[in-house]
C-alpha cells in the first residue's frame, strides 16, 4: 500500500511557482489533500477491517409437531436422532419464524454444551423447568461453509459503491490534483512559466528596481512639495544618497518639455555609483533584454490561458459528475443486507441475513467526502466566474503609470497578461516592479547611468583625434547613448555620432562653443529646446546618414545658420517616393547641399534653397536620373556635381545656370558631348570634369568655351586630342589619363598657362619638344606609356615639382633633370635603376629635400 506522502506528491509544485497560485488554487490543493486522506483512510480500513457476517434464515414450524419445546424430552435424544431430525427439516420443512444464533462456529459443540445430560435425576419436575434449555436455533453448518457464504454475500449482497468507494475517491482525487497543476507540468506551458518566474524573481530582487522606485517616490514627492530645497528633501527620500553637502535638488533642469523641478539629477548621478555598481548595472541591462525577448515570445499566443481554463472546466465537470452519482449511494450503504446466493445445493439454505461492519464508517466518510467535494466545486465555479468576468488576456499598467514617472510602460496581452493577472492574486508588488523593466524610459536611465560610469571625461579625451582639416574630432560608435562628459569637451570642433539610436543632446551642449560640425550616422538624435537653440545659432556643417527618411531628425530642417548639409541614404525605396525636405526653406544660409542617394529626379524642394545655394552635389549610386528640370531654378549655383547618375548626354538644364563655375559629370554613360558648344553661354565656367565616361572624341566646338581653366577627360575612350583643345589659352590643368591617345599634338606648346598635365595610362611613345615650352608646368605625369626617351629640354621646366615616368620604356634619364630646381626625389616617380643612371651631383641635388627638414629644425 502506498503512503499519503507518495500520493500527495502529485499535488506538489516547485516552490517558486507559488507566486502563480491564487488563493482558490491553494485552497483546492488543501481540499484535495483532505480528500486524499479520506480515500486512503477508507481504503486502509476496508483492507484491514472490512467484513461481512451472514447467518442462514431458518424456516418457521407450521405445526406443533414440527417444533420441539425446549423442555421436551425429545431434546435429550442422542445425536443420531437429532441429525435425522435435522435432515428431515432440511428436506421438506418450511417455516416463517426467523431466529438468529449466537454463534457462527461449529454447530456440534453448542449442541453438546447446551442440552442437559440425560442421566440427571428427575425427582422434582419443577426444578428441571427452572433450568432453561438453550434458545438458539441450530443450523448444522461448519466453519468453511460460513466462510464461503460470507465471501459470496460480500460480492452479491453488498452494493458496489460500498466496496469501491475508497478506490473511486482516490482516483477522483488524483484526477483533480493532476488537473490543478497540469499547466505547470505540460512542456509547452511549463517552459514559459519557468522562464517567467525566473525573470520575475530577478526583477523583484534587482537593485535597479529599488532604485527606480525610489527615484519615482522622490520625483512624486518633489512635485507635491516644491517648497523644499534639495538639501532638505534628499535625506528624506533617498536614504542611500550621497553626503549632506550635495548640490541643491531644486535646481531647475531644462529639457525638451520645459522647466521641471525635481530631485532627479542628484538621485541619478550621485547615488547611482553607490546604489548600482557596474555588476548590478550589467545584470539589470541583461534583464531588460530578457524581458523584451520573453514578451515577444509569450505575447504571440494564449496557450497558457486556454489550458488553465480547460483544466478548470474539467475540475468543474468532475465535481458535478462526482456529486451526481455519489449522492445516490449515500442511502444504499446500510448495516444489514439480505443475501440470496442460490447455493442451496451446497449449504442447504436459500436466504441469509448479513451484516457489514464498515457500513456506518463508510457512510460517514462518504458524507464527509461529498461535503468536501461540494466546497471544492463551489471554488471551481468561482474560478470560472473570475476567468470570464474580466478580460484576462489584457493587462494594463495604468495604475503603475499613475503612481510612477514611467508613463511609457506598455499594456501587455495574451499569456503575458494572464501570468501577470495570476501574480496579482499573490502580490501586486511583483507586477509593479516587473513593469519597471518594461519601460523604455527606465531602460534608458539605466543605460545612461552605466554609460556615464564607463565613459569618463578622461577616457573621452583619449579618443579625440585631429582630422584632415586639423580640427579636434571625437567619433563615438555604437553606444547606448551620448555620455554626459562629451559636453564638457568645450574645445571640440567636430562630433561624430554613429549607430547610437537613443542619442539625446541635452542643454549642456551649449558649453561646446567651438563645435561647428556634427555627424549623425544612423542616429536620429533628439534635442532639448535649449540645445536646439544653440545648434540653430552655432552649427555650420551637418552630416546625416540614414536608411529611411524617418531617421532624419525634424530639427535638421530648422537650423537657420547651417552652411553645409550632407544627406546620405535611401530616398527612392517603396516607402520613400519623395525626399522629405519640405522644410528646407528655413535653411536660409545653406550654401552647400550634398545628397548621396538613388534619386530618379531632382527633388523640387531643393529649389527652396536655390536663392542662396552655391554648391549642389548629387551622387546617385548608379540610379538613372531622369528629371532635371528643377536645376533651371538654381541660378546661383556655382558648383554642380552629378555623379553616377547614368546620364547619356549633358543635361540641357545645366545650360541655364549662368553662374556655374564648375561642372562635374563623373561616372556616367556619356558617349558624345556635341552639346558642349552651349557652354559658351556659361561665361563663368572654368572647370569641366567629364571623366570616367565613354567619350570617344572631343568636338572642335570646345574652343568656344574660352574661360576653361581645368579640363578632365580621364578614363574615357579618347584616341586623339583635337587641336581645338590647345586653343584654350586659360587652361591650367589638362587631364587625359587612361585613354587610348597615341600622340601629343605639337600645338600643346600654345598652352602657356598650363601647370598640370596628366597623360598617364595612354600609348604615347614620343614627347614633342613643344611640350617643354609650357614652362609653367608643375606636374607632368607621363607614366604607363611607351616613351623611349626623355628629351633633354625637360630642364626648361624650372617650376616642375612632380614628374612621373614609371612604366615606360626608358633606359636612362637626362642629366638636365638637375636644372629642374623645384624637383626633388619625392616628386620623381621612376624606377630605381633609372634613377641610378643620373650623375652623382644630380642625384645629390634631388636628395636635398631629405635633409632640408632637419636643417630647418636646428
Curated annotation (Swiss-Prot):
It comes from the Eukaryota. GO terms for cellular component: cytoplasm; endoplasmic reticulum membrane; membrane; monoatomic ion channel complex; plasma membrane. Pfam families: LRR_8 (PF13855), Pannexin_like (PF12534). The chain crosses the membrane at residues 23-48, 164-182, 309-328, 361-386. It catalyses: chloride(in) = chloride(out); iodide(out) = iodide(in); taurine(out) = taurine(in). Its main location: membrane. Keywords: Cell membrane, Disulfide bond, Endoplasmic reticulum, Ion channel, Ion transport, Leucine-rich repeat, Membrane, Phosphoprotein, Repeat, Transmembrane, Transmembrane helix, Transport. Residues 221-251 are annotated as: Disordered. Changing residue 44 to C: Alters channel anion selectivity. It is a multi-pass membrane protein. The modification Phosphoserine is found at residues 241-242, 246. Disulfide bonds join 54-354. Coiled coil: none annotated. Residues 49-163, 329-360 are extracellular. One of its GO terms (biological process) is monoatomic anion transmembrane transport. Non-essential component of the volume-regulated anion channel (VRAC, also named VSOAC channel), an anion channel required to maintain a constant cell volume in response to extracellular or intracellular osmotic changes. The VRAC channel conducts iodide better than chloride and can also conduct organic osmolytes like taurine. Plays a redundant role in the efflux of amino acids, such as aspartate, in response to osmotic stress. LRRC8A and LRRC8D are required for the uptake of the drug cisplatin. Belongs to the LRRC8 family. PANTHER family: LEUCINE-RICH REPEAT-CONTAINING PROTEIN, PTHR48051. The volume-regulated anion channel (VRAC) channel forms a trimer of dimers, with symmetry mismatch between the pore-forming domain and the cytosolic LRR repeats, a topology similar to gap junction proteins. This is Volume-regulated anion channel subunit LRRC8D. It comes from Homo sapiens (Human). The lineage of its organism: Eukaryota, Metazoa, Chordata, Craniata, Vertebrata. The gene is LRRC8D.
